[in-house]
Amino acid sequence: MNALTDADYVDVKLTAAEVLLASHVGCMRNVQSLKKATDRVEPEPRKYWQSNIIGAIGECVIAKYFNIYWSGAVGDWRAKDVGDFEVKTNEQIYKKNVLMVKKGNSPDRKYFLVAGNAFNYRIFGWVDGYDIMSEARWGDPPHNSPLD
């Protein structure tokens, strides 16, 4: 798998058990955030549950594809998502998917873009953290720039 391109993607099908496991991880992460009253950079606060669950499912997809153990870490927001990778997940496959990063994200990791729903997901590829964090890649601010 190469860096992000329009023609380079891989489809991954999760089992019901894998989706259930990842969903539980997302729920645990959300409860922990609520308990700690963590300040979050979330465009729509009512989607906290959704973003945590979808994010955990995306991590599960990458772990399955690369056959890497996924701990589903809860409580350490600085931990890497899967192995040495970070995963960004959209809940649907669009004609043009966008990999969004935050300014605080680590530039020394590879960022994978995953999209899908139910049991069917697509890995669109990856981009180097240093590359995506450079202002030249931000696109049309504020829509494609790293979030504050």
Regions found by a protein language model. Give the residues of each.
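Nucleic-acid endonuclease domains
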Residues: 1-83, 88-148
